[in-house]
Amino acid sequence: MSAIEVVRPGMLTTVQDWPGRIGYWHVGVPPSGPMDDLSFRIGNRVLGNPEGAAGLECTRGGPALRFPDGGRVCVTGAPVVVTLDGTPVPQWQSIAVPAGSVLDVATLTGPGMRCYVLVAGGLQELEYLGSTATFTLGTFGGHDGRPLREGDVLTAAPDSGPLDGRPARAAIDEQPSIGHRWEIAVTEGPHAAPEFFTRADIETIIGTDYTVHFNSDRTGVRLVGPKPQWARSDGGEAGLHPSNIHDNAYCVGALDFTGDTPILLGPDGPSLGGFVCPVTVVAAERWKLGQMAPGDTVRFVPVRADRAPSLRTIDVDRRASFPLVISTSSDNDDGVLSRFIASDGTDVTLRRAGDGGVLVEYGPMTLDLVMRARVHVLYEHLLAQDIPGIIELTPGVRSLQVQFDPSAMSIAEMTDLLAGLDGKLPPSHQLVVPSRTVRLPLSWDDPATHEAIQRYMHGVRADAPWCPWNIEFIRRINGLDDVAQVHDIVFNAEYLVLGLGDVYLGAPVATPLDPRHRLVTTKYNPARTWTPENAVGIGGAYLCIYGMEGPGGYQFVGRTTQVWNHCHPGSAQSFEPGTPWLLRYFDRISFYPVSAEELLHLRAEMAAGRGDVAIDDGKFSLGDYQDFLTDNDASIAAFRQQQAVAFSAERRAWDEAGEFRRAS
């Protein structure tokens, strides 16, 4: 082991490894890892390290590092001035660092956004959920879950020396082309034309040079470009804006329209959400997201999924040294791989989610717990089968995303496998699953939510229909007489957890079991840039508890205690050992009122590992639930009619005010 002293940390320098934190997408943990994986992996290969060995990612500028014991390094990524004791040294090759010397990586002047410092032997840090990659928003991984600071001391593993025959530098035709104009290969889907976007919208997306917005980071690259015309007038139960859909799993590299704003989701992006994604960057091209700088232009080039280069290769076959994407055709299927009617009469749609993913959707675009039960049956079956090549299984409201290794099986093979399961799964209408009751405190209309709204009004938009008070907006769009009714409904409801990770870290997306408690809203457009940790909001027909600070779009009703154990792997009451997420699928959440001051005390207790949550075991029977709906059909229909009238009135008001014509 050898020490590395941080003399100057750089603007934003973090420890990353590749492929990052895999296997936790279903609970809202992103992979993290190097945003430009190609430059990172090439640097490790030059040094004789495993491609995924931990190294440093440096955004906009690099650090100054002292090597008391000496070592070898390789600096890759965006072009930058690198010196060793004041003498310039080249990038993309192994550099011997004498004992006591200082390696200095300067500020990037462009093109590109990130450079990488790889060290022979790789950096040594404690793993969190199987990886040393830093997720700064979650404050875990890497060096104390944060960017480097002056005075930090890193540790490198012993240098085993270069492997026989391994080049000491990366060949020119292996180095990625980094400029100010980007072409990036995308596949169609999962949600394209004509269901969600018009044909003209898709032509515009493909034919436009988008500009990279300054408000971009590892969660996603925000783009500036034309506003879609949209194929739908709204998102129905999912929200008033046509970009809204029932929550489903995203994938890294998806072009996510949060309202009218396009964002390319990055390696620290969310796993679950309720917005449409018309195209997805192929895995081997995602490195480009890490080098896109504000003001750069981006052009999407459709390609056939089965002809996309492999993520696993980092040599000339990756074609990264070419600034242009060569493509003769796309799949020309709107991202729809298969549509059929299941043996029980259910509509099934299989959608492409990049070159290594399939999104299975059941039924019409409505909230139906029978469809969520079908998703659960498929999820449990695939888990039990332990099929080689499947990497992640992430349930949504009416969908299941299957991520797989395209070098192990093709999209066509995965499509055939999933379609072939029809009729082989147990009937979902007989589903009985474990279902715990979970009682959480709720500080109604908490001051932290008011702060978030004020930040939004001052920094994003002040004229939004949901400002200055989200609860009043919820009242209005649901046709209720006063905000006290909103309060009573929220506290009387029992919310069934349908998904985890919306947004991040075990955050539940849940819906009231009783449809008469389903308050329907739309989401912020554009989204908030800041949401307090554990804020509680409603978007579409769903409730969310935000797992951490970050962006968001649900309408606030209050704030609760933590749903993620940041003391992990230390023990904490209510959390199972080794499992930092509190909630499970099909848990039933209810709230009891506390003051803002009481909540602060409860949150402090939870953070210290002393807090407790009332949890009781139970079961959820879909058959019994169907009987409940039948018995209360008339009053449920009356409530929905009241909502529909108010929803239509709000939509007309938006139309008259030009909300749908508003530029993003």
Predicted features by range, described:
Residues M1-S664:
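Conserved "landmark" site that anchors the functional core of diverse proteins
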